[in-house]
Swiss-Prot record:
Keyword NADP found: no
Chief localization: cytoplasm
Family matches, as Gene3D superfamilies: 2.40.30.130, 3.10.310.40, 3.30.54.20, 6.10.250.550, Bira Bifunctional Protein, Domain 2 (3.30.930.10), Threonyl-trna Synthetase, Chain A, domain 2 (3.30.980.10)
Name listed for the protein in its UniProt record: Alanine--tRNA ligase
GO molecular function: alanine-tRNA ligase activity; aminoacyl-tRNA deacylase activity; ATP binding; tRNA binding; zinc ion binding
Organism in which the protein naturally occurs: Shewanella sp. (strain MR-4)
Reaction(s) catalysed (UniProt annotation): tRNA(Ala) + L-alanine + ATP = L-alanyl-tRNA(Ala) + AMP + diphosphate
UniProt cross-references to HAMAP family, sorted A to Z: Ala_tRNA_synth_B (MF_00036_B)
Length: 874
């Protein structure tokens, strides 16, 4: 009964549903309401605001089977995964919660009843822990539940500070906290380990299966513990641990879910030893990677995306270690969906996208994996001592895409540690170089610290009077500036938009009688807006009143491009999938640039579909509606928020019909029809997993279309036709070119045949074998293959090496007749010569080609060929 993981999950949720709990779906692995969390790592994450009293639900009891990831950040199990019985990057946390409803006695009774009556675990196999001073919990266990006192273990402050204990939970330095009680299962005396609190507690005999937290205090900054008005309960039980117990196995990797994934991975790769730890790593990692992609995380070089990339690459490396020769990881997704059952619904809905994303990342890493592993292996073989230097670790990271933990994983297998401090130093040095390379001018934003606020009135007004509150010249605060000075002007209120969210700062003028300040840019300095520019007339002092005038034409063109990025974002998500998220943007009066997460190049047909979708929304002339609301309300309405952006409690929401809704502080058109026309000008990759679209709108789009039309007409004229016949005429020209190339090759072959007759006379005989070594002049590299074939036919039993030096390059070809490949291999011969002319190459035993970059060394290299061949023909 309840042998499978799926059955356990259902039994748990049904038990608590029947006891008045609301069954709540697992939340996303990407926390929606907690910027402090990288990933959802506990069942209580989605209820954090409820526990803090900031959110109220229609229920006071809840139960969940929450998907969790612990990799990266504070909670990071990645290094141990595969090497222990219970560490995972992904796990499911079964939990029940009380929000000011029941408390200690009911929480304890629910847990004990489920374990002993529903799952029928032997009571004698269970023991419990309580916080040292939690007499109430001790009494409940002992008097109400009937657990013998010797099986109730008090745990004190065992982590070096008051309330720092395995049995005292706290959300942070202040806020809700309280004691907890934990239930442990005894796997038997055949396994090493001691009871909780004993010196041997880290063994695997006694395993914690359920943690019940009693949130009863509100910790003050002073350390004082004040009682909460409504104590609550937060519990958690890892489904993998309880499944291992129910299935009679000791390791989590032996339960049904992992058995199926390990077997499938072994089948795909061709491995027979199912106990191999690398199979454990792969089976664990496919769970976290697949569900992260399903929840919208894409591999990238920052934040959550980089953690995902690290996990994928670790799995790929372990596959390589097992002998995988092609992409295998993504092929585990169907098996994962099958074994996860109801918990995989979201994954099943996004299966195609998940498989494509994993395959793309795996194939990309495969291009550098072998070479990187070769360099690492060489470094480890030459290592003196037990520490790999930080420079090598950095080179593997920077050049071959090896995350530090992947390098550490390889080193661990050889009892080598990595110099993480040296790696960090190399990283810091690279950042300094990059920063220095980017500092082409003064960085006002970094240099100026302005303790002032500027009110923004530019959503509705483009002109207005304002008082000068500060002036900065050469980074220093000054009371006045004079004509010709390049400065930063700070106003108390401004219609100028300061660069933010990808939208460039406004340009315009600040004027008064006899004074004109030309604003070339507007930037944020904390809460102040700084107007950068030049005082072109008069003198200006702090306290003066000016009229601020934004350049209306530039602002209007910028607004067109900003509004269309919202439409573009929504269109990309419709066409490519909801995994698409904005990674960056640039919106100026001339064009727009939009960076987004996607695992492959956008196909021409997809780009066309995106463009048509955006233009359809433009033609529908939606009114842009702007509203301010609480951020939680905005997210409930489906507003897109950007990861990494910091939002206030009140946010600005921009809606375009039923097509797009985003959080945005930028300026926009009144209706989508104002945009006029949208035209994509380019699409390409800028980083692994990140694509970029560049586009134009309005008059710029019309000009772009006109330019394209003009080029089409010019091409038609060159082809002596009209625009309708360009494609047909180009095809005809290409066919003609192919025929000419074919005719030319035939001529080259005839010339090669004629030349071979003369060259054959230059062959020398070595031990009865014709050997021809020749440097050729005036012969195209493309003709070498045909020439070599002709010579082999003429010379019969022969070894041939031909070289051509032209335009600073060397081309080599080696040919060996079939009767001689047992003694002389063309690939080895050509590789030997190529190494001496700055190149490399290879091929079959009977024919091989190579190139080089040092033609000046060709004669010397060829002089060594005859002795090399003679030695092998002896």
């Amino acid at each position: 009964m309840y042998q499978t993981t799926a059955a356990l999950r259902s039994a748990f949720l049904e038990f608590f549903r029947s006891n008045g709990h609301q069954v709540v779906d697992s939340s996303s692995l990407v926390p929606g309401n907690d910027p402090t969390l990288l990933f959802t790592n506990a069942g209580m994450n989605q209820f954090k605001d409820v526990f803090l009293g900031m959110d109220k639900r229609s229920y006071t009891r809840a139960t969940t089977a929450q998907r969790c990831v612990r990799a990266g950040g504070k909670h990071n199990d990645l290094d141990n995964v595969g090497y222990t019985a219970r560490h995972h990057t992904f796990f499911e946390m079964l939990g029940n919660f009380s929000f000011g409803d029941y408390f200690k006695e009911d929480a304890i009774r629910f847990g004990w009843t489920f374990l002993t009556e529903v799952l029928k675990l032997p009571k004698e196999r269970l023991c419990v822990t309580v916080y040292q001073t939690d007499d109430e919990a001790f009494e409940i266990w002992n008097k109400k539940i009937g657990v013998a006192a010797e099986n109730i273990i008090r745990i004190g402050d065992n982590k070096g500070a008051p309330y720092a204990s395995d049995n005292f939970w706290q959300m942070g330095d202040t806020g809700p906290c309280g004691p907890c009680t934990e239930i442990f299962y005894d796997h038997g005396d055949h396994i090493w380990g001691g009871r909780p609190g004993s010196p041997e507690e880290d063994g695997d005999r006694f395993i914690e299966i359920w943690n019940i937290v009693f949130m009863q205090y509100n910790r003050q900054a002073s350390g004082e513990m004040l009682p909460l008005p409504k104590p609550s309960v937060d519990t958690g039980m890892g489904i993998e641990r309880i499944a291992a117990i129910m299935q009679g196995v000791h390791s989590n990797y032996e339960i049904d879910i992992f058995r199926a994934l390990i077997a499938k991975a072994a089948e795909i790769i061709g491995v027979t030893d199912l106990s191999n730890k690398s199979l454990r790593v792969i089976a664990d990692h496919i769970r976290s990677c697949a569900f992260l992609v399903a929840d919208g995380v894409m591999p990238s070089n920052e934040g959550r995306g980089y953690v995902l990339r690290r996990i994928i690459r670790r799995a790929v490396r372990h596959g390589n270690k097992l002998g995988a020769t092609e992409a295998f990881f993504y092929k585990l997704v169907p098996t994962l969906i099958e074994v996860m059952g109801d918990a995989a619904k979201g994954l099943a809905d996004t299966q195609v996208i998940v498989e494509k994303a994993l395959k793309a990342e795996e194939e990309q890493f495969a291009r550098t994996l072998e070479r990187g592993l070769g360099i690492l292996d060489s470094a480890l073989n030459e290592l003196q001592g037990d520490t790999l230097d930080g420079e090598t670790v950095f080179k593997l990271y920077d050049t071959y895409g090896f995350p530090v933990d992947l390098t550490a994983d390889v080193c661990r297998e050889r009892n080598i540690i990595v110099d993480e401090a040296g790696f960090e130093a190399a990283m810091a040095e690279q950042r300094s170089r990059a920063q220095a390379a980017g500092n082409f001018g003064a960085d006002y934003n970094a240099a100026l610290k302005i303790d002032a606020e500027t009110a923004f009135c530019g959503y509705s007004e483009l002109t207005g009077n304002a008082k000068v509150t500060a002036l900065y010249l050469n980074g220093e605060s000054v009371p006045a500036i004079n004509a010709g000075d390049d400065a930063v002007v700070v106003l108390d209120v401004t219609p100028f938009y300061a660069e933010s969210g990808g939208q460039v700062g406004d340009k315009g003028v600040l004027v008064a009688q006899g004074i004109e300040f030309a604003v070339s840019d507007t930037q944020k300095f904390g809460q102040a807006s700084g107007h950068k520019g030049t005082l072109t007339a008069g003198s200006l002092s702090v306290g003066q009143v000016l009229e601020a005038k934004v350049d209306k034409k530039l602002r209007h063109r910028t607004q067109l491009n900003h509004s269309v990025t919202h439409l573009l974002h929504a269109a990309l998500r419709q066409v490519l999938g909801t995994h698409v998220t904005q990674k960056g943007s640039l919106v100026d009066p001339e064009r727009l640039r939009f960076d987004f997460s996607h695992f492959e190049a956008v196909k021409p047909a997809e780009l066309k579909q995106v463009e048509e979708l955006v233009n359809t929304q433009i033609r529908r002339n939606h009114e842009l509606k702007v509203a301010e609301m609480a951020i939680d309300e905005a997210k409930e309405k489906g507003a897109m928020a950007l990861f990494g952006e910091k939002y206030d409690a009140q946010v600005r929401v921009v809606t375009m019909g039923d097509f797009s809704i985003e959080l945005c502080g930028g300026t926009h058109v009144g209706r989508t029809g104002d945009i006029g026309l949208f035209k994509i000008t380019s699409e390409g990759g800028i980083a692994a997993g990140v694509r970029r679209i560049e586009a134009v709108t309005g008059a710029a789009a019309m000009a772009y279309v006109a330019q394209q039309q003009a080029q089409l007409e010019e091409a038609a004229a060159l082809l002596k036709g009209d625009t309708q016949s360009v494609v047909a005429k180009l095809k005809a020209q290409l066919d003609k070119m192919k025929q000419l190339e074919k005719d030319m090759q035939q001529l080259k072959d005839k010339l090669a045949a004629a030349a071979s007759a003369d060259l054959a006379c230059d062959a020398v005989v070595v031990n009865g074998v014709n050997v021809l070594i020749k440097k050729l002049d005036g012969v195209e590299a493309g003709a070498l293959r045909g020439l070599q074939d002709e010579l082999k036919q003429k010379l019969k039993s022969a070894v041939i090496l031909l070289g051509v030096a032209q335009e600073g390059k060397v081309n080599l070809i080696a040919g060996v007749s079939n009767d001689l490949v047992g003694k002389v291999k063309a690939g080895e011969l050509v590789a030997m010569v190529a190494a001496q002319v700055g190149g490399k190459g290879g091929g079959r035993p009977d024919m091989a080609q190579a190139g080089g970059s040092q033609p000046e060394n060709l004669d010397a290299a060829l002089s060594q060929v005859l002795p090399w061949i003679t030695e092998r023909l002896a």
